[in-house]
């Protein structure tokens, strides 16, 4: 009997691989499939509101009864009272990583936190939200630069003062905001089904 499917709406292959690993890969009781839908991103500071708006669009596009989730991640600087937050993707796209780091040059506090918010619609159409958070420091880029801001974020829990980009995926997934949020989703799915 085939495993039930859950749709992850993303066009990011790195994110898909990482999430598949966190959710159990081939050993999970469901199959993770990707739908790279082009969803409008609500602009705002409320991450839960942004994720739920994206989820509503995904449910509309895929049709009711199909389990689906979306994910949104923010990187917030302590000195900027939460900014760039959900806008980090656009800051990096517009300015590049080096200039994003440079924004904190005149501040002693380089503290930051990352938050991942997952909005999930189960097969009955009920909506669920899961969120993970990790504190860290903004540093000059170290490691690969092919996955967002991983190379400029050094989590406080890093054993060797590594950025996400320098860490082994398994180590990163244990302490990252995405790993924490998806661990909650995984627990929900494994305990209640899809």
Swiss-Prot record:
BP terms from Gene Ontology: deoxyribonucleoside triphosphate catabolic process; nucleotide metabolic process
Location(s), subcellular: Cytoplasm; Nucleus
InterPro entries noted in UniProt: ITPase, ITPase-like_fam, RdgB/HAM1
Keyword Hydrolase: yes
Binding positions (ITP): 10-15, 54, 72-73, 89, 147-150, 172, 177-178
EC number of this enzyme: 3.6.1.66
Needed cofactors: Mg(2+); Mn(2+)
Keywords on record: Cytoplasm, Hydrolase, Magnesium, Manganese, Metal-binding, Nucleotide metabolism, Nucleotide-binding, Nucleus
Catalysed conversion reaction: ITP + H2O = IMP + diphosphate + H(+); dITP + H2O = dIMP + diphosphate + H(+); XTP + H2O = XMP + diphosphate + H(+)
UniProt-annotated binding residues for Mg(2+): 41
SUPFAM superfamilies associated with the record: ITPase-like (SSF52972)
Keyword Cell membrane listed: no
GO cellular component, one term: cytoplasm
Molecular function terms from GO: dITP diphosphatase activity; ITP diphosphatase activity; metal ion binding; nucleotide binding; XTP diphosphatase activity
Pfam families: Ham1p_like
Cofactor: record remark: Binds 1 divalent metal cation per subunit; can use either Mg(2+) or Mn(2+).
HAMAP family named in the record: HAM1_NTPase
PANTHER family in UniProt: INOSINE TRIPHOSPHATE PYROPHOSPHATASE, INOSINE TRIPHOSPHATE PYROPHOSPHATASE/HAM1 PROTEIN
Family: Belongs to the HAM1 NTPase family.
Functional summary from the UniProt entry: Pyrophosphatase that hydrolyzes non-canonical purine nucleotides such as inosine triphosphate (ITP), deoxyinosine triphosphate (dITP) or xanthosine 5'-triphosphate (XTP) to their respective monophosphate derivatives. The enzyme does not distinguish between the deoxy- and ribose forms. Probably excludes non-canonical purines from RNA and DNA precursor pools, thus preventing their incorporation into RNA and DNA and avoiding chromosomal lesions.
Subunit and partners: Homodimer.
Protein name: Inosine triphosphate pyrophosphatase
